[in-house]
Amino acid sequence: MERPLVFYSISLFLGCFFSIIFNENIYITVIIMLVIHIIIYLTLKEIKFTIIMFLFSILGVISFNLYFSFQPKTGALIRINNKYDYKVEGTIKGRKLILKNNIKKLEEGQLIKVESGDFKRNVVYEKGIIGEYNIQHYVLQNRDFRSKIYNLKRNINNKFINSLGKKRGSIVVSLCFGDSSYLEKEDKDNIKKLGVIHALSVSGFHLALVYKIFEIIFTMKFAIIASYLYLAFTGFKYSTIRAFIMILVLKLSDKFYGEYDSLSSISLAFLIILFLKPYAFMEIGFMLSFLSTLGILMFNKKISKYIYFLPSKLNSAISLSLSSQIFLIPYSSFTLKELSIGFLLGNIFFMPIFSMIIIIGVIGAILCPFKYIFNVVVLVLKNLCIILEGSTYILIKVCPDLIYIEEIFGIFIISIYICFMMYKAGKVKYKYLPLFLLVAVFFNAYTVFPKVYILKNEKVKATIIKYKDESIMYCDYDLEEGKYIIELKDNFNIDKVITNAKGYLPIHIKENKLKAINFYKEYFHKNIDNYEGYDIICMKSNDYKEYKIIFGKIFRIR
């Protein structure tokens, strides 16, 4: 069988996937895996290959259950990964857990030994969290390699921010080391609008640049070691682990075998990461990294051939940008719910600047003990940041806003892909099938009958009204809770926000006037009662009520 690693990685994924579907019930999962692989055998007629695939699926089931059935014991060593205002996230033997109670003095990167505390199993599958540890007493362990890395990273981050200023320093730190915690929301929104938000989280692009720098200056072995150190320095992100494995396979194949298959390489990376972290396929960052790379591997050269008449640099930038989005767009419609129309502009104009900032920034991090050399690096970075700010200002003016997309759009894109493949295979009659889904996409985007969303929690009260191509939100909230309003505006794709409105203001809907401003006013009290309170407001969850007004009658949708 050609490219067996592709099939083995799919089998491992199926084992993990069905394990979560059937909530760790091993017996049902194994039976389903057996049935699937019997069908595979009847199709391929290859018994040895099918058995190996089945074993990989069983490996996925075992890995998943071993991960989530783990029970920490007193005296366990826990690594502190992330610290928030109200909780701390740590890892114990590769498993994530939430730490509570005695956590005020904990810092990221520290290694602690829990002397006393209670563990409560509270699994969050999509984040790989096995439960909560209520810590009573702990002992801080001596600094090891990873804690020293965390401390070094903090010092370097602070040095860049102090030298460049908070705004520019945070951009450099985000681009070079993937730490966007210092970044201002305005900068994040601008970069997101331009479709280059991936540059703020360390990706394979970053690691490839770092590897190339050290390979040119030194040797391949030194470059691999330096890349691994960069991997550790940036926190072992999925995208960098994937890129490191693929680079390692590429260099080893060049040296020992002379043949490199990119699809087998990415499949091996997928298999290794999923075996170690069987929940990874539920994390958006993992899927974005693999789907974008898969799109590049499969379609970059094909797109490049179609635009052969363009200059080579422009051809490369456009083909890379378009191919990386082929699988990301449908996936984003099911998860992120938003799409940047200006991603092509962002990638063409920004990626060269980002590349220079990353290269100079990494060199600056290495040479930061040398004051005068570091000052020269800071001067270069300042000028690059000025160029970046000017480019951002211009492109933001011409780049269209993010658009909100729903699942039906993703289904439409997938149908186009399927119909195109069938058309290429000679099934000409299927080429018009996406047109039927296009009608559904239109009616989904254009609200024929008015929709009303009712939201309420302890901090924010809001009514959202959508009609035709417009959407208005009326909300009542305290000034310090403004971040919730921003979240609502982004998640519901709001055109206009009216805050703390008094009395009734008419909204014209066909011949009728819908006089609903604050949902706690009498109009909706006559039709809707028993409001629930929620802790989180997000359209991606079910924390809202939806109503549709059809010919003056109100119907509850959810």
Ranges and model annotations:
Residues M1-L77, F214, K302-N457, I464:
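Transmembrane helix-bundle segments that form internal channels/tunnels in multi-pass membrane proteins
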Residues F7, T29-L34, A223, S227, ...:
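Hydrophobic core segments of transmembrane alpha-helices in multi-pass, intramembrane catalytic enzymes
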Residues L14, S19, Y133-I247, K251-L252:
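Aromatic-rich juxtamembrane segments at the membrane interface
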Residues I20-E24, L231-T240, F256-E259, F275-F286, ...:
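Membrane-interface helix caps and helix-loop-helix hairpins in membrane proteins
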Residues F68-I92, S116:
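Structural detector for short beta-strands of small beta-barrel domains
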Residues N101-L106, I112-E115, D144, L209, ...:
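Non-globular, low-confidence helical/coil segments that flank catalytic cores
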Residues E108-E126, G131:
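Flexible glycine-rich surface loops and low-complexity tracts that mediate binding to linear polymers
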Residues M220-I225, G258-I272, Y308-S316:
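Short hydrophobic alpha-helices at membrane interfaces in multi-pass membrane enzymes
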